[in-house]
């Protein structure tokens, strides 16, 4: 008999119902639960899958380069980055009528195309690419790397080349290699690329493999490095009249500390960026020698942790036992990695618009909005994943004996205090913020807007002033002309910083007022509530007041009736599930705030945000309704334009989102009735009844139905906002 799916679980493969398919898909990546899994095979499978992941990433980025080179207008865009719309790829659609063909034929293309809002044109331009040939070369190189990654993954699954468990658990060596090799070497290599290729290209000097060894990136070469005159590398930077991509106004410096932005491109100075990467490389080369390996230098992480015993004894046995706990738990390590990556991704979103690194990207408003929103959503999903794996760690990997009275055990022991404090913070933020908004709504509704409660964010304004923003008149630190830091800033370091922070044409330290104060606290409410749900889910994963015996029930047990006090909504999975809704709504508020504030800034009517953002009707009317009006006008052959597809996607996104609720408000008996009815109808329908299946149809489990609902809610939510964001921004600014 042919083996049935799933091969990794004999128990499931023999299941006579459709549960076999769904549970097979659900546990396909849960290697730990597979038949015949050993610790060694687990580590090797994950290691090999990393190469597969790299192959997919390289293939995807190669595809971006290839399609732009083939169907884009990169060379035309390079000649006039501010007025030519960058093309992502061509559209070939049988459904397009003549009005659609005309509406989507843009950017000098011969037929319908999609416009790129990803910033890849600006990125490739900044790093020195100039022709389609450059793009094709990059695509082929990445395709080669993709193939190498696939071969490497297959190679490391061969018996002779499988690494041992001890190799995977050698934390010090891995850290040293990742710090020095991954971060250090790649940062140094990137500095090299910027200095040898990107900076000369920005000054009109074309450097490629044929002349790479002949063109000195700095007139005196490595002389200043060996003679200790490093300051020479910063002398004669590009002038404020420099035209990017030409020699007009160009200097010779390669490593600078100018601060602020290039006046023409509105992006960070390339020579500052090169300097930054060189500094990072230096720091990481040192960091990569921090942990002791075979060479006898550096520290043992275990020794460091075991030495961490607080003198007063207030933290019990301190960090004893933590090294083995972390080193033997893949879920703990994944949780730490996801938490770090989530924070970094959110910081990337904040810095991409406030300190744009790519030439001319700051003037491409739709791209700025799309990139900010994209990175915040990615960060949200990654961070919720961190807590999910933290919860799985407590269920599968946590050993109370090994961690007796250390910081981890003590955190579990006072989890009630942690959870209740988070709860109080959330309640305080929620009631007070909503109270202020609602009060202001009532005052406007009753015709007394002067009675609004408007609170100036004075602490945040003081922090902005300390960084040099002079508008508020605080006269503190960098905004005080008497401060030594202010005077040094004019001459020694970052002379361009103070000009940039006080220039109203960029997004650096935006002016804030009462509307910002309110939405800041609304976002704080969302963050604290999301954190509360996630932290509670992880800390209660092994057992809670209601159900002290969760360990053997696993991560995602379903509702189980009133026995043991009822198990509804108390598995760690239930907490993750609820937290994702809060995460999405919180990021909704974050992106609404960012987008509305920037639209008014770009249009030159900041008063609209300042006046309308202090009450809820202002948000609904002047942000959501006003900016979606183009998307709810409908579409027809006469009014067809390039926003019509976004109008359709806006509708479609709402539909997917609403479908999610059908799966969320239900219980298992409902699904079983539904599937029985569908199966009955199918078997009695001509033609359809000639198709039979071997598996008996059974209902979705409660957890599965919730997952289907959550997936539709998330996808629909993001589709809806993506259409709104891109259409409302590109509709205004082209």
UniProtKB/Swiss-Prot annotation:
Subunit details: The PsaA/B heterodimer binds the P700 chlorophyll special pair and subsequent electron acceptors. PSI consists of a core antenna complex that captures photons, and an electron transfer chain that converts photonic excitation into a charge separation. The eukaryotic PSI reaction center is composed of at least 11 subunits.
State any GO CC term.
chloroplast thylakoid membrane
Tell me what this protein is called: Photosystem I P700 chlorophyll a apoprotein A2
Binding residues for chlorophyll a B3: 662, 670
Species annotation: Cycas taitungensis
State where [4Fe-4S] cluster binds.
559, 568
Instruction: Report the EC number(s), separated by commas if there are several.
Output: 1.97.1.12
Give the main location: plastid
Outline what the protein does.
PsaA and PsaB bind P700, the primary electron donor of photosystem I (PSI), as well as the electron acceptors A0, A1 and FX. PSI is a plastocyanin-ferredoxin oxidoreductase, converting photonic excitation into a charge separation, which transfers an electron from the donor P700 chlorophyll pair to the spectroscopically characterized acceptors A0, A1, FX, FA and FB in turn. Oxidized P700 is reduced on the lumenal side of the thylakoid membrane by plastocyanin.
């Amino acid at each position: 008999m042919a083996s049935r799916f799933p091969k990794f679980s004999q128990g499931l493969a023999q299941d006579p119902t459709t549960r076999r398919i769904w549970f097979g898909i659900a546990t396909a990546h849960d290697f730990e639960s597979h038949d015949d899994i050993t610790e060694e095979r687990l580590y090797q499978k994950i290691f090999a899958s990393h190469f597969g992941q790299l192959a997919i990433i390289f293939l995807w980025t190669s595809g971006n380069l290839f399609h732009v080179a083939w169907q884009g207008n990169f060379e035309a865009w390079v000649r006039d980055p501010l007025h030519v719309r960058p093309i992502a790829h061509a559209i070939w659609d049988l459904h397009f009528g003549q009005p659609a063909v005309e509406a989507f034929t843009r950017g000098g293309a011969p037929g319908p195309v999609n416009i790129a809002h990803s910033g890849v044109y600006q990125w490739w331009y900044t790093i020195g690419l100039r022709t389609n040939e450059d793009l094709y070369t990059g695509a082929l190189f990445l395709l080669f790397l993709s193939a190498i990654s696939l071969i490497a993954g297959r190679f490391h699954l061969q018996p002779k080349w499988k690494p041992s468990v001890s190799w995977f658990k050698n934390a010090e060596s891995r850290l040293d290699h990742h710090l020095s090799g991954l971060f250090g070497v790649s940062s140094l290599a990137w500095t090299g690329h910027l200095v040898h290729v990107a900076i000369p290209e920005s000054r009109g000097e074309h450097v490629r493999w044929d002349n790479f060894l002949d063109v000195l990136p700095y007139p005196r070469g490595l002389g200043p490095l060996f003679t200790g005159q490093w300051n020479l590398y910063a002398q004669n930077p590009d002038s404020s009249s420099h035209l990017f991509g030409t020699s007009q106004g160009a200097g010779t410096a390669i490593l600078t500390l100018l601060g602020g932005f290039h006046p023409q491109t509105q992006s960070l100075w390339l020579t500052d960026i090169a300097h930054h990467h060189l500094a990072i490389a230096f720091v990481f080369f040192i960091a990569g020698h921090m942990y002791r390996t075979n060479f006898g230098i550096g520290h043992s992480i275990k020794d460091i942790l075991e030495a961490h015993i607080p003198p007063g004894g207030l933290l019990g046995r301190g960090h004893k036992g933590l090294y083995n706990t972390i080193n033997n738990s893949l879920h703990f390590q994944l949780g730490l990695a996801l938490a770090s990556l989530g924070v970094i991704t959110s910081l990337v979103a904040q810095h991409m618009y406030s300190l744009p690194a790519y030439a001319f990207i700051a003037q491409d408003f739709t791209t700025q909005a799309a990139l900010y929103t994209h990175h915040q959503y990615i960060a949200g999903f990654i961070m919720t994943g961190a807590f999910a794996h933290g919860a799985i760690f407590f269920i599968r990997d946590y050993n109370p004996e090994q961690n007796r009275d250390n910081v981890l055990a003590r955190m579990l022991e006072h989890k009630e205090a942690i959870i209740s404090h988070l709860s109080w913070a959330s309640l305080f933020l929620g009631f007070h913020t909503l109270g202020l908004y609602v009060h202001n709504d009532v005052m406007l509704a009753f015709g007394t807007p002067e009675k609004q409660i408007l609170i100036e964010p004075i602490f945040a304004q003081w922090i902005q002033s300390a960084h040099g923003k002079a508008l508020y008149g605080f006269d503190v630190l960098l905004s005080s002309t008497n401060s030594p830091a202010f005077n040094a800033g004019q001459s020694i370091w970052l002379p361009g910083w103070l000009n940039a922070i006080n220039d109203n044409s960029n997004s650096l330290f935006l002016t804030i007022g009462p509307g910002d104060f309110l939405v800041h606290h609304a976002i704080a409410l969302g963050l604290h509530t999301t954190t509360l749900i996630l932290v509670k889910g992880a800390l209660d994963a092994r057992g809670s007041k209601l159900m002290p015996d969760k360990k053997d029930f696993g991560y995602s047990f379903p509702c189980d009736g009133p026995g043991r006090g009822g198990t509804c909504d108390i598995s760690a999975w239930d907490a993750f599930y609820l937290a994702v809704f809060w995460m999405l709504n919180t990021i909704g508020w974050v992106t609404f705030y960012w987008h509305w504030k920037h639209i008014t800034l770009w249009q030159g009517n900041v008063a609209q945000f300042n006046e309308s953002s202090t009450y809820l009707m202002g948000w609904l009317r002047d942000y959501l309704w006003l900016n979606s009006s183009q998307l709810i006008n409908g579409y027809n052959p006469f009014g067809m334009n390039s926003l019509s597809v976004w109008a359709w996607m806006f509708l479609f996104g709402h539909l997917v989102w609403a479908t999610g609720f059908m799966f969320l408000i239900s219980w298992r008996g409902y699904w079983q009735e539904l599937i029985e009815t569908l199966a009955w109808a199918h078997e009695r329908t001509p033609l359809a009844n000639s198709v039979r299946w071997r598996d008996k149809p059974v209902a979705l489990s409660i957890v599965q139905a919730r997952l289907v609902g959550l997936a539709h809610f998330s996808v629909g939510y993001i589709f809806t906002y993506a259409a709104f964001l891109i259409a409302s921004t590109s509709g205004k600014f082209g």
